[in-house]
A protein has these predicted regions:
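Glycine-centered hinge/linker elements that transmit conformational signals in sensory
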Residues: 22-53
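Stable alpha-helical elements in mature extracytoplasmic
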Residues: 3, 7, 33-40, 56, ...
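Extracytoplasmic/periplasmic substrate-recognition and gating elements
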Residues: 41, 45-46, 84-152
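Extracytoplasmic/periplasmic solute-binding protein
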Residues: 1-25, 65
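C-terminal capping/gating helix-and-loop segments adjacent to ligand/active sites or protein-protein/ligand interfaces
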Residues: 110, 173-197
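Flexible glycine/proline-enriched surface loops and loop-helix/loop-strand junctions
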Residues: 16-26, 61, 111-116, 186
Length: 197
């Protein structure tokens, strides 16, 4: 779904406007969206893009592809070695970069992640759920949580605090690169929630 969301963001960065029909399907009459889709389709047909039921990090770790597009939390699933199909291995030299963007346009980024909800319940349970959310998003606790999981911080000050964070898991440098990339995106990209139908 990350490549498809990138197609959508590319179309929006080019000024497509709404590209969904009232039934939630893509509007194939939207010229800007169609061109973004065809750019992706041509790259796919030429073998420049791999679409698979595997996560992109799996294909990076087996040496099948040189790069992948995925969520920030995918950092949890990278090994420190690349293991090729023939069993040979070499050290992983992971580099984490900001999400690709359209040249000359305002950068957009997908905003997705863990959703917390509380079902209609008793007042006491609702208060307990609210207390848990406040506890989890308290600045220092949230900083520790996101630094261990690859999630984007929910507190603005956490981006500044994470620059000097010293408890990242291994590979430490990859986590530092991840949060440097996320900080760039937080400062210069506009987040968009995924569409709801």
């Amino acid at each position: 779904d990350y490549p498809i969301r990138s197609v959508e963001l590319n179309a929006l960065e080019h000024g497509s406007g709404d590209f969904y029909t009232k039934n939630g399907w893509y509007d194939t009459n939207n010229v800007v969206f169609k061109e973004s889709w065809m750019q992706f389709a041509r790259s796919l047909a030429q073998g420049h893009v791999v679409v698979s039921d595997l996560y992109s990090n799996t294909q990076v770790m087996t040496g099948d592809v040189l790069s992948g597009l995925g969520s920030s939390a995918a950092i949890l699933y990278y090994n420190d070695t690349v293991t090729y199909r023939d069993g040979t291995q070499e050290p992983m030299d992971l580099h984490v970069l900001p999400m690709p963007k359209t040249a000359g346009a305002d950068a957009l980024m997908a905003q997705a992640g863990v959703g917390l909800c509380a079902y209609k319940t008793t007042d006491q349970k609702a208060e307990a759920a609210a207390l848990f959310v406040r506890w989890l998003t308290e600045s220092e606790r949230n900083l520790d949580f996101v630094a261990q999981t690859g999630y984007m911080p929910v507190r603005n000050g956490a981006f500044d605090a994470i620059e000097n964070y010293d408890k990242f898991p291994e590979p430490t440098e990859s986590y530092r690169q991840l949060y440097a990339a996320l900080k760039i995106m937080q400062e210069s990209y506009t987040p968009l929630s995924e569409p709801r139908f």
